[in-house]
Amino acid sequence: MSTESMIRDVELAEEALPKEAWGPQGSSRCLCLSLFSFLLVAGATTLFCLLHFGVIGPQREEFLNNLPLSPQAQMLTLRSSSQNMNDKPVAHVVAKNEDKEQLVWLSRRANALLANGMELIDNQLVVPANGLYLVYSQVLFKGQGCPSYVLLTHTVSRFAVSYQDKVNLLSAIKSPCPKESLEGAEFKPWYEPIYLGGVFELQKGDRLSAEVNLPSYLDFAESGQVYFGVIAL
């Protein structure tokens, strides 16, 4: 019931009172009726304000949305997110430690994987779909002394479907030895790691390779030191 209809009912009730009621007793009745009318109007106004500003009313939906998820609902949400992530192409290959002549990548070793369309063909990772990819690689070089000036390079290259030229995506050059070696430096061992990583937009069928210029210096003493990977974002 609206405030206007409440006030209209009160006015009709006042008009229905007999004229003789306006005596000494009628005055008290009129006062009570006026007080009742005031309280009724004030209550209706307060109720209207509370409903208008949303203090009370249909807040059940908002309340339900703020309720914490049950363990079953949380598990379903995490499982759905995990399935979406598991559908993306991913590759992580490791180096063959028996070959010192060239850097050969293997996918069937511990901690290596090819998933969701990624392939390793002719020592290159083949991209299965268009999109953004994180491309990364690490190598570790090891040597004994500096009989001569040594330059070590590590490069990640792309053979695109749109053009067959080899293009370097990532590249780094390091030297473990200064140009002028100190006396006795030729007897000291040295280690030189190189890490490369970046995000690139690749196309289906693109081939990626990771190479070094001096594979004979690679250190395979520990697993996880030389690797190459691609992850779809």
From Swiss-Prot:
Compartment annotation: Cell membrane
Keyword Glycoprotein attached: yes
Ranges per topology, Cytoplasmic: 1-35
Major location category of this protein: membrane
GO biological process: extrinsic apoptotic signaling pathway via death domain receptors; immune response; necroptotic signaling pathway; negative regulation of protein-containing complex disassembly; positive regulation of apoptotic process; positive regulation of canonical NF-kappaB signal transduction; positive regulation of extrinsic apoptotic signaling pathway; positive regulation of JUN kinase activity
Alphabetically ordered keywords of this record: Cell membrane, Cytokine, Disulfide bond, Glycoprotein, Lipoprotein, Membrane, Myristate, Phosphoprotein, Secreted, Signal-anchor, Transmembrane, Transmembrane helix
Phosphoserine modified-residue sites: S2
Molecular functions (GO terms): cytokine activity; tumor necrosis factor receptor binding
SUPFAM superfamilies named among the record's database cross-references: TNF-like
Modification note: The soluble form derives from the membrane form by proteolytic processing. The membrane-bound form is further proteolytically processed by SPPL2A or SPPL2B through regulated intramembrane proteolysis producing TNF intracellular domains (ICD1 and ICD2) released in the cytosol and TNF C-domain 1 and C-domain 2 secreted into the extracellular space. The membrane form, but not the soluble form, is phosphorylated on serine residues. Dephosphorylation of the membrane form occurs by binding to soluble TNFRSF1A/TNFR1.
CDD domains documented for this protein: TNF (cd00184)
Lipidation (N6-myristoyl lysine): K19
THD domain span: 89-233
Any single GO CC term annotated in Swiss-Prot or TrEMBL for this entry: cell surface
UniProt cross-references to PROSITE patterns, sorted A to Z: THD_1, THD_2
Keyword check for Cell membrane: yes
Transmembrane intervals: 36-56
Residues carrying covalently attached carbohydrate according to the record: S81
Gene3D superfamilies: 2.60.120.40
Membrane topology, as annotated: Single-pass type II membrane protein
Record topology, Extracellular segments: 57-233
Function comment: Cytokine that binds to TNFRSF1A/TNFR1 and TNFRSF1B/TNFBR. It is mainly secreted by macrophages and can induce cell death of certain tumor cell lines. It is potent pyrogen causing fever by direct action or by stimulation of interleukin-1 secretion and is implicated in the induction of cachexia, Under certain conditions it can stimulate cell proliferation and induce cell differentiation. Induces insulin resistance in adipocytes via inhibition of insulin-induced IRS1 tyrosine phosphorylation and insulin-induced glucose uptake.
Family: Belongs to the tumor necrosis factor family.
Subunit comment: Homotrimer. Interacts with SPPL2B.
Record-given protein name: Tumor necrosis factor
Lineage, broadest ranks: Eukaryota, Metazoa, Chordata, Craniata, Vertebrata
